[in-house]
């Protein structure tokens, strides 16, 4: 039976259409996915992300452990609260999961991992943490609400006490701080400013209701997906998985190659891939009528006249832009245009960088 987050009752009271999402009953939308999408781009919306897993790591060798576990390097984290995005790779360089890691003290770090990968993530982390003597605590006692949009931080701040407001005021992106009952982080999955707030399960419903009263619109998984796709953000299982290199998923920037003597899981395989080349992730824009959908083939001819085929990993109609966009994994050598096969029609598409909207503005 699918699990329910502590906010399940709030979703039903708000009129949500609930669906099974990786064994969690989650809101798909509350009536209009388009309205929810636009609320985040123009004002403030919120998402229940309590299905994600928060994992606290403690021990004197925690930093050393994470420098081995992750492709990005937590040696970069020197200021308490600073966060880092990274892939957690297998030995062949495939992506077990993408996650965020927060640094608090030398013996205390926090991971936030995806819900669909929870069990394999915890198994992998536990297996590799043992030699380092790491204490692992899964924070199932916490719920998490993402408040996103140009007015999200101001509206959320009306619920904070003086100490919380003082600490988060002017906090830069990718930081997190614990103040009282709230863990407040300047992270998100929409391409907009906002907070991701973790708080005790028993306080989540009251906090959700207070956000509604503050003018924050409840949003479901549908809007979350169109928002993240516009922002060019990967979805695990679509842009990457255990068979796909981060180099083929626009995650090359998350691999810390320096220092060269740092050994991390998957490094050896990545070195070979970097030398010989991989596929790459690109953006596609189609202004013609129609919608680019997942798994449609993408065809192009390179400069030498050779024909190649890739695949759309995520595609949708963009509510912000008013036309269809997609992320596609394609061979090297793609030019500025390609062809996508939609049923029996060959549709021309423009090839772009894999990001379409940032802070409400078109970049594609």
From Swiss-Prot:
Transmembrane segments: none annotated. Keywords: Aminotransferase, Transferase. One of its GO terms (biological process) is glycine decarboxylation via glycine cleavage system. Pfam families: GCV_T, GCV_T_C. It is an enzyme of class 2 (transferase). GO terms for molecular function: aminomethyltransferase activity; transaminase activity. GO terms for cellular component: cytosol; glycine cleavage complex. Its EC number is 2.1.2.10. It catalyses: N(6)-[(R)-S(8)-aminomethyldihydrolipoyl]-L-lysyl-[protein] + (6S)-5,6,7,8-tetrahydrofolate = N(6)-[(R)-dihydrolipoyl]-L-lysyl-[protein] + (6R)-5,10-methylene-5,6,7,8-tetrahydrofolate + NH4(+). HAMAP family: GcvT. The glycine cleavage system is composed of four proteins: P, T, L and H. The glycine cleavage system catalyzes the degradation of glycine. Belongs to the GcvT family. This is Aminomethyltransferase. It comes from Shigella flexneri serotype 5b (strain 8401). The lineage of its organism: Bacteria, Pseudomonadati, Pseudomonadota, Gammaproteobacteria, Enterobacterales.
């Amino acid at each position: 039976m699918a699990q329910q987050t502590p906010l399940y009752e709030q979703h039903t009271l708000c009129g949500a259409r609930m669906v099974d999402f990786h064994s969690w009953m989650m809101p798909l939308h509350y009536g209009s996915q388009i309205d929810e999408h636009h609320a985040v781009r123009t004002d403030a919306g919120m998402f229940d992300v309590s299905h994600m897993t928060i994992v606290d790591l403690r021990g004197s060798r925690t930093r050393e452990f994470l420098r081995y576990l992750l492709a990005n390097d937590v040696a970069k984290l020197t200021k308490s609260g600073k966060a880092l995005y990274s892939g957690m790779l297998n030995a062949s360089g495939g992506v077990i999961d993408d996650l965020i890691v927060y640094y608090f003290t030398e013996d205390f770090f926090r991971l936030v991992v995806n819900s669909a990968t929870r069990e394999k993530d915890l198994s992998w982390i536990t297996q590799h943490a043992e030699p380092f003597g790491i204490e692992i605590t899964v924070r199932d006692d916490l719920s998490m609400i993402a408040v996103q949009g140009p007015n999200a931080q101001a509206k959320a701040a009306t619920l904070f006490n003086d100490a919380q407001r003082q600490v988060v005021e002017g906090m830069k992106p990718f930081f997190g701080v614990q103040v009282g009952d709230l863990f407040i982080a300047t992270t998100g999955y929409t391409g907009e400013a906002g907070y991701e707030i973790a708080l005790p399960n028993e306080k989540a419903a009251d906090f959700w209701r207070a956000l509604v009263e503050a003018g924050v619109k409840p949003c479901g998984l549908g809007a979350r997906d169109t928002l993240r796709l516009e922002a060019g953000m990967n979805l695990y299982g679509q842009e990457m998985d255990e068979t796909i290199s981060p180099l083929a998923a626009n995650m090359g920037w998350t691999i810390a190659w320096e220092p060269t003597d740092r050994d991390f899981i998957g490094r050896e395989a990545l070195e070979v891939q970097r030398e010989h080349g991989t596929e790459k992730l690109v953006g596609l824009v189609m202004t013609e009528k129609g919608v680019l959908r997942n798994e449609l083939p993408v065809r192009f001819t390179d400069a030498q006249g050779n024909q190649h085929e890739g695949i759309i990993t995520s595609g949708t109609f963009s509510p912000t832009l008013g036309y269809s966009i997609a992320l596609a994994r394609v061979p090297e050598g793609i030019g500025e245009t390609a062809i996508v096969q939609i049923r029996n029609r060959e549709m021309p598409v423009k090839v772009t960088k894999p990001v379409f909207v940032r802070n409400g503005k078109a970049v594609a």
